[in-house]
């Protein structure tokens, strides 16, 4: 365990981040509502920044949800990155996500498609998130060869980076797989009330004292938010039960 980690974990414990994940469904959604009311993206300001920095920013629509494309040139590049932000499926991206998207475009020469995917709430469940994310990838394959597309996701977005293609396999593989998937800190929200997952629940409780961020209780709360009373395919909630047949080279990062 590095000194940097020890310092960071101590700070996280002291500021009480973990307490937030003890909130119930209603409290968590109220918290998310407040976070999502903040203005984190202004299209006109973003376009002005693109002009100053000599690149192009395009605003698109995917099933009623915004998608912005960072491009070095007015015409599409040979390859692209689908950027899926993190936020537990309930909170919007932050300003660092946009800066990183810009940086990826500048350093790789690839276009970056940034999807504002549907967030889970009382009225929107995770199957809608998958539907829109899958459609965004389908649209990408109309512009770029699938092998020239990389899919990058963080946290809940990392779950989507895998889940889009678990979904593709589940519905008969209508789309070609991307060239690579980069999944940073993916998780899952298995049903810990069923017998086959009891061991997972016991391990979560056993490791709780080591986890400086998330209390095991949140697994149940997050599942309640994402699923509600809907009949949702289990792979959308717990990617470990999905079909990984013919997946491309996939990079996992944790920490």
Where on the chain are the PLM-derived regions?
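A glycine/proline-hinged amphipathic helix-loop "lid/cap" segment
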Residues: 1-73, 217-220
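Alpha/beta-hydrolase superfamily serine-hydrolase fold, recognizing
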Residues: 7, 57-59, 63-68, 72-255
């Amino acid at each position: 365990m590095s000194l940097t980690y020890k310092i960071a974990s101590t700070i996280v414990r002291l500021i009480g981040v973990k307490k937030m994940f003890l909130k119930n469904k209603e409290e968590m959604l109220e918290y998310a509502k407040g976070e999502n009311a903040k203005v984190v993206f202004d299209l006109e300001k973003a376009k002005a920044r693109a002009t100053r920095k000599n690149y192009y920013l395009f605003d698109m629509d995917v099933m009623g949800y915004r998608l912005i494309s960072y491009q070095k040139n007015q015409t599409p590049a040979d390859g692209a990155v689908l950027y899926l932000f993190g936020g537990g499926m309930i909170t919007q991206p932050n300003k660092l996500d946009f800066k990183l998207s810009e940086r990826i475009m500048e350093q790789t020469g690839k276009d970056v498609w940034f999807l504002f995917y549907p967030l889970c709430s009382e009225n929107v469940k995770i199957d809608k998130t998958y539907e829109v994310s899958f459609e965004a990838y389908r649209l990408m394959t109309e512009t770029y060869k699938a092998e020239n597309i990389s899919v990058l996701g963080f946290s809940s977005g990392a779950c989507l980076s895998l889940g889009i293609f678990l979904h593709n396999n589940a519905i008969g593989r209508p789309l070609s797989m991307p060239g690579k998937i980069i999944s940073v800190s993916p998780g899952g929200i298995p049903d810990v009330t069923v017998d086959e997952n009891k061991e997972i629940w016991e391990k979560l409780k056993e490791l709780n004292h080591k986890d400086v961020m998330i209390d095991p209780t949140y697994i149940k709360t997050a599942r309640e938010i994402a699923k509600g009373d809907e009949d949702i395919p289990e792979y959308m909630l717990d990617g470990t039960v999905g079909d990984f047949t013919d997946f491309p080279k996939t990079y996992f990062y944790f920490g």
